[in-house]
Amino acid sequence: MMKRETFKIADIYVPVKRRATLNPSTVQQLAQDMLQNGQKSPILVRRDGDRFVLVEGLHRLEACKALGEETILGYLVQAAKH
């Protein structure tokens, strides 16, 4: 079973291809939900040297950024580079 961890948002790299799928209205809706209910679903990241690369959870990550958060809940996974 994976262990949920807290990651510094500044240490998470978002690949360019993944950034292209960003929907600002989804980010806004998630940010509102997170204000009321907290972060429900952790993101997925993989290690790449000294940083982490986002695997899943772009909108959750951006919602946390919009709320001024410095950390986010996530799981560290073993994933192939795309």
Language-model regions: role of each:
Residues K81-H82:
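Short, charged recognition helix plus adjacent turn
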Residues M1-Q78:
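Short, charged/polar connector segments at secondary-structure boundaries
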